[in-house]
Amino acid sequence: VISDVQFNKIQGLIQKGIDEGATLVAGGIGLPDHLDKGYFVKVTVFANANNSMTIAREEIFGPVITLIGYDTEEEAINIANDTDYGLAGYVSSGDMDHAKDVANQIRAGQVIVNYVGGNSDTPFGGYKQSGNGREKGVWGLHDYLEIKAITGF
């Protein structure tokens, strides 16, 4: 990661996940085993988490994933939307119409369906506390424009 501040923030969140009872599947605190300096974070996976845990509620911005189980699609959508943030989401389905329906219910600036990421033409940006500006594509150009309305002719 970019700095000791971000490294320490991520390390604190990983520790918080452990302290709050999530199952540490991979990774954890500290540098990767083959490194003794730098701001490298171990790829970390938590399972058996719930949406009340800090690691599920914060944008970690590091190689940390929190897995939360669900029983119904409605519950999954509620979990996805029960956050102060909304940068991105992911939907996987063999039925594209159904996937689009689910994606439309997720309050995030970008929802990826059956794909590894967006492309350079799609706008990227968040909802809620993840921000509301857009980068990339035609929407990204709006930040560089000054709009003028002329009325009364």
What is each PLM-predicted segment?
Residues 14, 20, 33, 37-153:
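Conserved C-terminal structural/oligomerization subdomain of aldehyde/semialdehyde dehydrogenase
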Residues 23-33:
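Cytochrome P450 fold signature focused on the C-terminal beta-domain
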Residues 1-11:
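Short beta-strand to alpha-helix junction loop
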